Amino acid sequence: METLFNGSLTVGGRDQESTGFAWWSGNARLINLSGKLLGAHVAHAGLIVFWAGAMNLFEVAHFVPEKPMYEQGLILLPHIASLGYGVGPGGEIIDTFPYFVSGVLHLISSAVLGFGGIYHALIGPETLEESFPFFGYIWKDKNKMTTILGIHLILLGFGAWLLVWKAMYFGGVYDTWAAGGGDVRIISNPTTNPGVIFGYLLKSPFGGDGWICSVDNMEDLIGGHIWIGTLEIFGGIWHILTKPWGWARRAFVWSGEAYLSYSLAAISAMGFIACCMSWFNNTAYPSEFYGPTGPEASQAQAFTFLVRDQRLGANVASAQGPTGLGKYLMRSPTGEIIFGGETMRFWDFRGPWLEPLRGPNGLDLNKLKNDIQPWQERRSAEYMTHAPLGSLNSVGGVATEINSINYVSPRSWLATSHFCLGFFFFVGHLWHAGRARAAAAGFEKGIDRDTEPVLSMKPID
């Protein structure tokens, strides 16, 4: 029971005594009012979609086609561009109208959701069980809860399949690995081999292994969505048709707050994964839109100066740096030829502008001398000066390169925000899980405050 200074305060006809929660506990007052809780959820969805639409249009209004997206602080347009809308060869933005349409569609959707949220919060029935039993529920009804879980899984699976259909049949998606510097293409042969797809899940998360963040081709990425979309749809059907088994009934706490805690744990995990994915991966998050990764900017610096000095007559194969190690090229711990100097720590980086210059034993000296294309030089010079860790005059986190510009990479925004959100959602999971377990065990949440000294003191003012 929450303790209010003003215990008589009533909001919306629901006071602390009747609900067990103070006014600032918000939707907790609606735990047993399925109709009102539906209104809160729909209105919340409307707010989310409104932000997406409004921010989308804000980015369109401020977008300058002559500058890369990542120099303009954009976080939504890069996502739409990655889906292949309005993009030409090399990641050039050739049409902003699809971005405008996306913003307008989200705004219209938010209006519909907002109306539905207000209707159910203010006008609709307080509970749904009597009038609309299909949409009604009781938190302890285990069969109903797993049915709702199943419906959610089917919707998530359908969402995963939407990306598959877009990539395979409706215009394709942007592939940063397409020949010549990236392009929009149809993914006609996605990977369905379970050994490949689930191999990502079994990889180490450390170093060059990178767990699922190491996906480096669109075939595997779209194939992964085929698998997860299919599994979620079949899992949803399973949960709708079956009742929880005995071990599941005993293992879980079956209450509204428990389900909230499970959801917070899941979204926390997704936040941490999104953090790593947006920071390290340059296939799902193409560098043309999001800027280079940290290792990419560092490798680009080494490549740019190798190109420059090779033109000036340097023997890049044998030149030594001040430490006696290779100035331009050296050997990795496992024998591959890699870039030398400070960037050696990022030797397992892979990027579409660099991979054509590799051979079976790492970087190919003959290719470095004869096959470097102008687009590779331009792109590495651009990435060198746009490190995501960069502050003023910084490349790859090393504050020595005077050609850098002062900007904050979308990768920095996305990785930092998702890490922070993931952390706080995890704390929320612990909080609500503890409360739910305490309630299920039969003891009062919180502490007895009857003897707390502050309750007998005069108000400060």
Curated annotation (Swiss-Prot):
**Where is the PTM Phosphothreonine found along the chain?**
3
A Gene Ontology molecular function term for this protein is: metal ion binding
Subcellular location, principal:
plastid
A GO BP term here is:
photosynthetic electron transport in photosystem II
Q: What is the annotated localization of this protein?
A: Plastid, Chloroplast thylakoid membrane
The protein's matches in InterPro entries, at most eight in alphabetical order, are given as: PS_antenna-like (IPR000932), PS_II_antenna-like_sf (IPR036001), PSII_PsbC (IPR005869), PSII_PsbC_sf (IPR044900)
Q: Cite the cofactor comment.
A: Binds multiple chlorophylls and provides some of the ligands for the Ca-4Mn-5O cluster of the oxygen-evolving complex. It may also provide a ligand for a Cl- that is required for oxygen evolution. PSII binds additional chlorophylls, carotenoids and specific lipids.
Q: In the UniProt record, which is one GO cellular component term?
A: chloroplast thylakoid membrane
Does this UniProt record's set of keywords contain Kinase? no
Question: What are the alphabetically sorted keywords of the record?
Answer: Acetylation, Chlorophyll, Chloroplast, Chromophore, Manganese, Membrane, Metal-binding, Phosphoprotein, Photosynthesis, Photosystem II, Plastid, Thylakoid, Transmembrane, Transmembrane helix
Q: Where are the transmembrane segments?
A: 57-81, 122-143, 166-188, 243-263, 279-300, 435-459
State the annotated membrane topology for this chain: Multi-pass membrane protein
Spell out the residue numbers of the propeptide.
Answer: 1-2
Which residues take part in binding [CaMn4O5] cluster? Answer: 355
Question: N-acetylthreonine modification sites?
Answer: 3
Report quaternary structure and partners: PSII is composed of 1 copy each of membrane proteins PsbA, PsbB, PsbC, PsbD, PsbE, PsbF, PsbH, PsbI, PsbJ, PsbK, PsbL, PsbM, PsbT, PsbX, PsbY, PsbZ, Psb30/Ycf12, at least 3 peripheral proteins of the oxygen-evolving complex and a large number of cofactors. It forms dimeric complexes.
The entry's family comment says: Belongs to the PsbB/PsbC family. PsbC subfamily.
Protein name as it appears in the record:
Photosystem II CP43 reaction center protein
Q: Which organism is it from?
A: Oltmannsiellopsis viridis (Marine flagellate)
Task: Give the taxonomic lineage as stored in the record.
Answer: Eukaryota, Viridiplantae, Chlorophyta, Ulvophyceae, Oltmannsiellopsidales
Gene name, Swiss-Prot/TrEMBL: psbC
